[in-house]
Amino acid sequence: MIKALVFDFVQTLGDAASGYKDGEKNAQNKLIEAMGITDTETFMTHFREIRKKHFLAADFDRKNQWKELQALYGKDLGEAFLDKLADEYWQFVIDAMKLFPEAEEVIIDLKKKYKLGLICNSQRDGSTRALQSPEFERACKYFDSYILSGTDGIPAKPDPAPFKMMLKNLGVTEDEVIYVGDDYRVDIEGAHGAGIKCVWLKHYSVKRNWPENTLGVPEITDLKQLAELDLLK
């Protein structure tokens, strides 16, 4: 019997896709200008490759990506420049963050029947600032437990530790909880590795090259579809 649901926040309950896109574009343009790049096509190839490498290593600190990029070109723009660029990046994200249209209604309905938990990743970088949005506070009030993984000695998702910690916080077992997230590697593979049933949200409003669902977990494109899943019946 399911007694609890646990969610990721960014791109699961809160949508800041346009902010991430605008923040990336702003960073790319300013790096190109500051580094005196003329071959922008090759630069963008390097930019994407470095970003992918860091994300796969669960390093979401944009400054680390930019430092590697500038080193590749033999440049050093200085900490002040990168700090300012990171501030601008995360401000785009904060300004864009809005709960998905159906999110609050779904959370309120679920709260009547289940315990609710949130697990959000941070790498002690600016990514925590994505949670400074009023929309995060608006959602947080409905949850019984909230874990910021990647801080205070708590490993970041997909490590099983934050998932196991949430089970303890909510007083449930692996068989009594469902985890909902959007990132296949971080959320779905992470929860699955912790022995937790999971649901993959591929929200209809988010344009992304989704990976293959190799685990065969249930998929939804709207949070309202949670109530229709056999897992909750």
Range-by-range predicted roles:
Residues 28, 76-81, 110, 138-139, ...:
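A broad, low-specificity signal for short, low-complexity segments enriched in glycine/proline
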Residues 1-5, 15-18, 104-108, 114-233:
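Asp-based, Mg2+/Mn2+-dependent phosphohydrolase catalytic module
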Residues 2-101, 125:
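N-terminal helical cap/lid subdomain that shapes the substrate entry/recognition surface
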